[in-house]
């Protein structure tokens, strides 16, 4: 087909396609030029690596291949649904749909995986292989057995797709089987105790060497999945809603009452040291999971983990979100500083590709990019975290939940075109305003 069309026609069609894609560019008004360059590069690498015609989702490095690096060769992991998918959802929904199709076409493997561990429903593997969706990492390591939160990211991605598109047919025919399956998996995974419902022996984002009880990120994400599944069950007049809401509302969250912060897990203490202890897992439950707690508890939890983030920043994924947490607490200078250390320091010139680890903090790590989780994390920080955008079944005008506090020097975040429920909208989030707004084209 390409030979028949000829090079010039293909080139013209490619330019036309990119002209449309760039209408979803995230504009950082007032920011120093390097920030816009970083945002544009991240946007390009993400959209260049995901397309509506893809049948294998995208891997941790998108289309890049690094022969000197032995990880993630075609593996599809939680990073995609958590960090890459949300930015695509509103700017290129067809590409986002393709990422979900990869999961929906491999639910049999997730069902077998859950059964193998003695659970019901769907448990997606930690590192999914494109051929049939089975686990592809052949190691006897704790995180393969206990790091199960990938299923929560997958389910929330399907819920977000339905909220953003309003596609009722997709909900009934595709999304529901995943949401119901993961909700049933959570139901069989929790243990009822005098404290409510608990998830024991889990490994979260920090990837400790040993599993912990009641990992804050895992429990918050599980509660969000159950509430989403319950809402859709009522919408479709299916069973399960009351049970799922009951578990979600009483899923135990470890809180240090004396210091007033959400603990990363049951055994977590403030005197623990090292990168794993400093990983802000509890904050990841606030964003991008959107688990709500009392505002005072949220603020003090953010303060607690940002005070320890020096030991963590430079590691993958959550580093790119640190600026959001500082902004939520009203620290504009801190937000800029954390984005610098949590994202800009990962980026390699001259092509502005984000590495897996910070080049400044870990100069001996191999140069490998563009790493989808980090660049996606920065994009969703700008598109969702700083604008207060939380997708839900409500009308789009009600999606914005927070006052606009941007990094120091940034005046606004604007996107000329986002796709919301089949229509094109313009996003405007101006520093100091009470809420961001969507304007229909």
Per-segment meaning from a language model:
Residues 73-78, 86-90, 208-302:
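Extended ligand-binding clefts on enzyme/binding-domain cores
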């Amino acid at each position: 087909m390409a030979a028949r069309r000829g090079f010039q026609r293909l080139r013209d069609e490619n330019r036309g396609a990119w002209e449309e894609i760039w209408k979803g560019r995230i504009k950082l008004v007032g920011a120093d030029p390097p920030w816009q360059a970083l945002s544009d590069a991240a946007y390009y690498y993400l959209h260049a690596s995901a397309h509506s015609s893809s049948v294998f989702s995208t891997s941790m490095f998108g289309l890049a291949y690094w022969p000197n690096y032995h990880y993630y060769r075609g593996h599809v992991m939680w990073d995609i649904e958590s960090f890459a998918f949300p930015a695509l959802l509103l700017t290129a929904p067809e590409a986002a749909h393709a990422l979900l199709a990869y999961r929906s076409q491999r639910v049999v493997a997730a069902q077998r995986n859950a059964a193998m561990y003695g659970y019901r429903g769907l448990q997606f593997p930690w590192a999914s292989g494109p051929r049939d969706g089975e686990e592809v990492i052949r190691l006897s390591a704790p995180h393969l057995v206990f790091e199960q939160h990938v299923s929560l990211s997958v389910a929330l991605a399907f819920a977000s797709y339905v909220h953003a598109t309003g596609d009722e047919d997709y909900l009934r025919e595709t999304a529901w089987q995943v949401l119901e399956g993961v909700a049933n998996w959570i139901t069989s995974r929790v243990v009822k105790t005098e404290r409510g419902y608990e998830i024991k022996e889990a490994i979260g984002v920090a990837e400790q060497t040993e599993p912990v009880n009641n990992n804050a990120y895992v429990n918050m994400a599980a509660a969000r999945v159950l509430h989403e599944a319950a809402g859709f069950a009522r919408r479709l007049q299916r069973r399960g809603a009351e049970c799922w809401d009951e578990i979600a509302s009483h899923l135990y969250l470890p809180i240090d009452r004396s210091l007033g912060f959400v603990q990363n897990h049951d055994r977590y203490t403030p005197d623990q040291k090292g990168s794993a202890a400093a990983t802000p897992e509890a904050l990841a439950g606030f964003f991008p999971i959107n688990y709500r707690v009392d505002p005072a508890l949220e603020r003090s939890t953010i303060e607690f983990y940002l005070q320890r983030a020096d030991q963590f920043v430079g590691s993958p994924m959550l580093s790119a979100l640190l600026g959001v947490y500082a902004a939520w607490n009203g620290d504009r200078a801190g937000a800029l500083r954390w984005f610098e250390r949590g994202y800009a320091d990962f980026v390699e010139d001259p092509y502005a590709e984000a590495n897996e680890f910070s080049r400044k903090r870990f100069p001996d790590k191999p140069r490998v990019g563009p790493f989808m989780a980090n660049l996606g994390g920065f994009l969703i920080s700008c598109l969702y975290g700083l604008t207060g955008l939380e997708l839900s079944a409500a009308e789009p005008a009600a999606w914005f939940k927070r006052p606009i506090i941007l990094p120091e020097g940034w005046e606004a975040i604007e996107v000329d075109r986002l796709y919301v429920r089949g229509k094109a909208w313009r996003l405007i989030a101006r520093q100091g305003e009470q809420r961001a707004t969507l304007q229909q084209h």
